[in-house]
């Protein structure tokens, strides 16, 4: 830790301070924690968004006077889809001389990004100093390169590049070197990922071609319908503020069974996959600190979970199931996802006896699962005889959706008439941490 090499008093006076939000992705929190900067977290307000009053109080705190101050916030939560008031946060940070940086990974595919909006009044500065985007959430984005955009005024040319290597220099002598003056080139060490960069550019073009108005309208309609219908199901607990106007189309939820006990989040994802072919994500979505708040996990309980994980019991980690309602979905497909989640919340507990739980990994495996997995190789790809892919008509898709839902209900009805599987409770401290039925 380089901080140990510095005098504590000197460090306290000169150490940069980074204000981070209450719903950061790990990439916008752990990277700051591991730097020489001090990180200070801004609270949630009553509406589940960044508390601007608390942020202003921190900016006025004399402990942070005469130190470089940076605000680094998610433009939206990748867990609940909650959108940050980027303009208000930027204006507030600049009012006190701090830099305004935003992680746009969760919402860049769906919203406009304006780094230089018009000021609302004289002296207002709502500009953004830097944004960072991982475009993997864009349509066609997986495998594209990350994007960093920043205002030239915050770049210190007197310092060497972030990574000094090939491609960053104009000339290298026997004992010294001259770095390239052009910022973008001097910050691209080594051989660039050309295809990945081209792919990143193309996915932004797709977004622009469709238009954020179209994207926002479609996703808002899907989100409104999902939240409205799931609110009628007492077994579903949607995380975060349920107001669809405050969100992008990302929804995380948990499910309780008839006895009030939770179904494990990874069990939910397995049922959605096995019964309906719907891919969802289970876990904490790389947002552990936010998860503590959403799930009301206090520090002593958190330490107990940490101890269990260190002992190899990763399956005990709390979390949620996350689904996305994307703008490319038509109403039939969005309704299918909504209906499938409702089914799992209503009938999922009947399927517990069909699955084995691995406490070490949290994996749920069907007891009759078996057979060889499909081969992943060039030979297998070239040998396929599946023919050309075809687009299914709306009528055929609706027919298939109804069929899958009916088949799932038929299985649930059969299981309901069979003797209930005996539920298992872990012993000792592990039992105290067991929040789910199995």
Residue ranges with predicted function:
Residues 3-70:
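PLP-dependent aminotransferase-class I/II
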Residues 136-227:
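Active-site C-terminal subdomain of aminotransferase-like
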